[in-house]
Amino acid sequence: MKSLKKLKELETSDVFNILHVRTILKVIKIDKCISLARHPLVNITVGDDGIWFHLEDGTMINGLEYKTICEKELGFQGFIGIIILDSEDTLQELRLNPFQFKRRLIHMKVDTPEEFMLCGLVFALENLPLKQSTLHKLIAKLVLFPALSPITKILFNTCDTLVCTLRHIFFNEHASEILHKVPLMIRLYNEMKNTHIEVLELYFNTKRSHNFINLSLESRQLQDSSLQVIQLATQFAQTFYSKNGDTSS
């Protein structure tokens, strides 16, 4: 029985090591109008006293206070996110067709201040030009927070992977503890960007300019489709939240 329990724990751990939740957006429902909104973050900094969110209105809050900010927003229903595997983001497209994509969208029922903070951090890591020193300090702070729930585990793993990916592709860090957390597809793409190997260009089916790399999935096209991630996510949200009513409580 003990061996079986350990096996189940290992399987659960493996699942959270290969899955990420990306493109976490706020769901806003006012009357019958449903929309997806980006987080109001313009920067994050890390100090001895915690992780700090710099907001669009010029204020700065401790990341653990972000839950209060979100819950005060009119019509806030929670977050929507996309579950992906390492191999599915090529930095050019998301390797999911529209049918598969719809099955990966989730309504994120987050409860704790830590979970709200992690949702904000995923957005920041995907979208904001963060300093190298901030990335170095961030994970050291995050490991101090207990990952007690499945959603906390997958959010932490997502942040960890994004931090290592940013350190590798933007700051040219190649330490083994960084590289083994960077998805192989992204490592290959970064190699193509630097060396222009024709075989890799054929594999990725692209001859585009490689000067700009963006970790945000919002504008990624889906596989075999002209639809972008944000378009299909918005369609899903409008359908789901219209049928399910208020999900904020």
Swiss-Prot record:
Instruction: Report the principal subcellular site.
Output: virion
Bilayer-spanning residue ranges: none
**Which Gene Ontology terms of cellular component type are present?**
host cell Golgi apparatus; viral tegument
Q: Which UniProt keywords apply?
A: Host cytoplasm, Host Golgi apparatus, Virion, Virion tegument
Where is it located? Answer: Virion; Virion tegument; Host cytoplasm; Host Golgi apparatus
The record's comment on protein family reads: Belongs to the herpesviridae cytoplasmic envelopment protein 1 family.
Function of the protein = Plays a critical role in cytoplasmic virus egress. Participates in the final step of tegumentation and envelope acquisition within the host cytoplasm.
- The protein depicted here goes by the name Cytoplasmic envelopment protein 1
* Gene this protein is translated from: U75
